[in-house]
């Protein structure tokens, strides 16, 4: 869970380490973008700036193309813990915060999600994109970011096709 204000009980060094981790992840996110699950394109941010939320740590802006038209979108960005798993209640709280601030979408970035969190896709009108962070980001301090590679990849339902077979059997093809 990422917080922008240090709780009084949290040691300063621990708070600063978490803040540094989030800053490094946002820097990589700005350069690498987010690879979409079902689209050939990626979200490429035109800007990422800090946001004073309890769960949302930044506002990312990007252009979305639809019907030949470009439209700027505002994304609330939630960065999960460096070591640990994002829970469904964390995602729900982040999505609620994003909706309250009129964001178009919540982009959650984490190394791991609980099973129940993986099923959470929308809160009201705000879609929730869950991007799995590449384990290479654990070495982000040493990682030279060229913008290449898929450091943040949105995941969701697998793309499958059901193919009827003889003898009342079916084949499931995973694309």
Task: Set out the residue ranges of the language-model regions.
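S-adenosyl-L-methionine-dependent nucleic acid methyltransferase catalytic domains
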Residues: 1-175
């Amino acid at each position: 869970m990422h917080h922008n204000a240090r709780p009084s009980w949290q040691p300063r060094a621990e708070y600063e380490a978490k803040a540094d981790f989030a800053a490094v992840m946002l820097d990589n996110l700005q350069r690498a973008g987010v690879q979409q699950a079902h689209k050939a394109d990626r979200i490429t941010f035109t800007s990422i700036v800090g946001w004073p939320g309890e769960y949302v740590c930044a506002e990312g802006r990007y252009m979305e193309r639809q019907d030949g038209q470009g439209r700027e979108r505002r994304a609330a960005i939630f960065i999960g813990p460096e070591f640990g798993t994002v829970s469904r209640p964390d995602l729900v709280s982040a999505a609620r915060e994003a909706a309250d601030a009129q964001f178009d979408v919540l982009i959650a970035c984490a190394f791991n999600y609980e099973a129940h969190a993986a099923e959470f896709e929308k809160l009201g009108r705000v879609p929730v994109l869950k991007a799995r962070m590449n384990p290479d980001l654990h070495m982000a301090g040493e990682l030279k970011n060229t913008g290449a590679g898929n450091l943040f990849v949105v995941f969701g339902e697998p793309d499958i096709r059901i193919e009827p077979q003889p003898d009342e059997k079916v084949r499931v093809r995973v694309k």
